[in-house]
Amino acid sequence: MSNIDVKQNWKRWYPEEIFLKNSKNKKKYFWNLYKLTQQDFFTNNENKKNSNKLKKTDELKDYPSKEEAYNLAFKSGIEKKEEKKILFNDNLNKLLSNFEAAISLFDQMLFTRLLKTILIISSYIVGKNIKMDELILLKNVKKIINNDSFFLKKKQLIIHPNNKKFLEKIIKNSVYSDKWELCYDVNIDINGCKIRSENGDIDNTIEARWKELCRLVSEEC
């Protein structure tokens, strides 16, 4: 064998520290050294091995068995599932509540807008800002005189001043023969009229029809 091989394979060796197993009886052992055997000593490595074994033993004692670990994992999984279920139900309830509130708000807004649309259309149909239609006015007046004059006492026919000449010319004889008193009011619409008597009042103006329309719509709501 060459010197090179010897140098390469050479490893430095250190003697191990040796300790007495029962260190309390050191004095006794010193007086009886000839009685000591190999079993009375231990090295540092053996001490480490024993310590590691003790640690592993303690860890095994603390570590749960497979069945216990399975039960713990199963219980933990159930709890997490229940938490997710509760969270899901809460979110679902919130979503349904918000949806119900949104639908209710939508219905309310839709109803309000629909009502406004109806009122606007009705106002165009029966609005005040229209031209006088002699046929409409004459029809309304004749209807009231023919149907209601028998039941009315001290009756007054109230019309717009602009219709004075027209009505006096057309129904003059009927008005005076039935003892009607013609009265004029600028606040009455051009195609409307009112009847005032001791028995009661009859309002055949656009304003009255408009109020009645609003009342009927409100009752439907």
UniProtKB/Swiss-Prot annotation:
Disulfide bonds: none annotated. Keywords: Bacterial flagellum biogenesis, Bacterial flagellum protein export, Cytoplasm, Protein transport, Transport. GO terms for cellular component: bacterial-type flagellum; cytosol. GO terms for biological process: bacterial-type flagellum organization; bacterial-type flagellum-dependent cell motility; protein transport. InterPro entries: Flag_FliH (IPR000563), Flagellar_FliH/T3SS_HrpE (IPR018035), T3SS_Stator/FliH (IPR051472). Needed for flagellar regrowth and assembly. It is found in: Cytoplasm. Belongs to the FliH family. Pfam families: FliH. The keyword tRNA processing does not apply. It comes from the Bacteria. One of its GO terms (molecular function) is cytoskeletal motor activity. This is Flagellar assembly protein FliH.
